Regions:
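Non-catalytic terminal/interface segments that mediate subunit docking, oligomerization
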Residues: 11-18, 65-66, 371-441
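Long, well-ordered, tryptophan-enriched scaffold segments
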Residues: 187-408
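Active-site glycine- and acidic-residue-rich loops that bind
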Residues: 160-164, 296-306, 412-420, 424
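Generic beta-sheet signal
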Residues: 65-67, 150-152, 181, 317-325, ...
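Active-site flanking residues adjacent to catalytic metal/cofactor-binding acidic residues
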Residues: 156-159, 185-186, 323
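Short, well-ordered beta-to-alpha junction loops that form the rim of enzyme active sites
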Residues: 72, 323-326, 441
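Short internal beta-strands
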Residues: 67-70, 180-188, 440
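Cofactor-binding active-site loop characterized by glycine-rich and histidine/acidic residues
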Residues: 4-16, 20, 24-34, 43-176, ...
Length: 441
């Protein structure tokens, strides 16, 4: 059953990546564009989170959970919602256009069950932390006990970790005993204007642990771990973990033959050591198999992701997942130094379409080109825990508010003093309004 589950999730991951990539391609190359200006859409940034979001939305998340999706992964989010039946074809076809699916997830403009608006980089991340604290406050007041507590999840672009409000939020979480919060860092190490500084993940790990978080580093997938267990494998592990981010990305873009040349040069020409085992490890793999192995980072490995997320559900401690990924994973843009705002060419999209057995004219079909029966995929989607209760837009009863408040009887006072007196008077009443006012400073 587990193998079948992984097979289905892998098929859905490929479909999600295709739909997201095609949505962006349609907006830039097919839809009428009188201005001639680039529409954009961040194909590479979306691709790096496709596996993580597949694991979460199709297998791990529950209806009570809430997710802040990093802004540039909105095409992946919309594709997932489309497969769930909670996004329309028309909205996808008008992505980044009038009345279309939004560039960045928007709770007010999108129709597909967005939990947090994340267009302002970094703010959605911190909002999940404070939402978790509010959930605890509501529970402490005895409200909402008829519903299970949810996890507040942020999917974070690694460059978002430059935003100062995130670090301020971490301190607040520590002060108030933060629980049930997951932050998943999409650690692809490439952004618009830089490559992430070497070793930054160790600083993240130390910082989060200092604030009481568990830290799970998802660096290697199962294929890599299996290779490390082979003779010569530990030397391959050491090379991967010491490889500079810029070099790893460049070799990813160049492909299997480039990987082979570099690995053989670096690992098999060292004096004073028998190079047989590590040479054999490399040479028994084809170029394609070697490229697949080197791309099998933890953030692209479904078994590793599922295990990590499901383990984290067994407790309520906050968890930071540092998921190593490749920007543009699964696309010809993978690893390219300029892929942040890059777009696949019509020729590249045609090759991808053919490789996925998607017929021309059927690009939007939900199950076109899938290797598993449509009824199997439909059944799996229908049974996904996340959508068990449909869309999750909830309402609460309106709290009565008096038309006017009694003005404090003082000959003169500051506005701060007056506001404090008003709050004091409200607090003395036995009303729903008094019970629900929260003051902050």
């Amino acid at each position: 059953m587990e193998n079948s589950r992984l097979e289905i999730l892998a098929e859905l991951q490929r479909k999600v990546l295709w739909l997201a990539t095609w949505t962006i391609h349609n907006a830039n190359h097919i839809r009428p564009n009188p201005s001639g200006l680039k529409v954009g859409g961040h194909q590479a940034s979306s691709a790096s989170l496709a596996t993580v979001m597949t694991a979460l939305y199709f297998a791990v998340l529950r209806p009570e959970d809430r997710v802040a999706v990093k802004p540039h992964a909105s095409p992946i989010f919309h594709a997932i919602q489309y497969l769930f039946g909670q996004q329309t074809l028309e909205k996808l076809q008008n992505f980044r256009g009038f009345k279309g699916a939004q560039s960045y997830p928007s709770r007010t403009k999108d129709i597909d069950d967005v939990d947090f608006s994340t267009g302002s980089v970094g703010l959605g991340v911190a909002q999940t932390l404070f939402s978790s604290l509010v959930q605890d406050y509501v529970r402490a007041k005895g409200w909402g006990t008829d519903r299970p507590e949810g996890h507040m999840v942020a999917l974070i672009g690694d460059a978002e970790m430059d935003e100062g409000n995130i670090f301020e939020a971490l301190a607040e979480g520590w002060k108030h005993g933060l629980r049930k919060t997951w932050w998943v860092v999409d650690y692809n190490r490439q952004s618009l204007d830089a490559v992430v500084r070497e070793g930054l993940w160790t600083k993240f790990e130390t910082m989060f642990r200092n604030f009481g978080w568990d830290v799970v580093v998802l660096r290697h997938g199962r294929l890599q771990e299996a290779a490390f267990a082979e003779p010569g494998g530990e030397r391959l592990r050491d090379w991967i973990e010491a490889c500079p981010n810029q070099l790893y990305s460049a070799l990813t873009f160049q492909g299997g033959a480039a990987w082979r040349r570099r690995l053989l040069n670096d690992l098999c020409k060292q004096e004073g050591a028998d190079q047989g085992p590590v040479s054999a490890l490399i040479e028994r793999r084809s170029d394609d198999a070697l490229a697949t192995l080197m791309g099998n980072l933890g953030g692209h490995d479904l078994p590793s992701l599922l295990e990590a997320f499901e383990q984290a559900r067994t407790h309520d401690r906050p968890v930071c997942f540092i998921a190593y990924t490749i920007k543009g994973f699964g696309l010809p843009l993978a690893g390219h130094k300029d892929n942040h705002a890059g777009l696949m060419t019509p020729e590249q999209i045609a090759i991808m379409r053919q490789s996925l057995s998607v017929r021309a004219g059927h690009e939007w079909d939900k199950f076109e080109g899938t290797s598993l029966p449509e009824d199997v995929l439909r059944g799996f989607l229908a049974a996904a825990p996340f959508i068990a209760q449909g869309t999750r837009r909830l309402t609460a009863p309106i709290i009565p508010v008096p038309d006017a408040l009694t003005v404090p009887a003082q000959p003169a006072m500051s506005t701060q003093h007056g506001f404090g007196l008003l709050m004091h008077e409200i607090a003395k009443t036995d009303t729903d309004l008094a019970r629900r006012i929260v003051t902050t400073s």
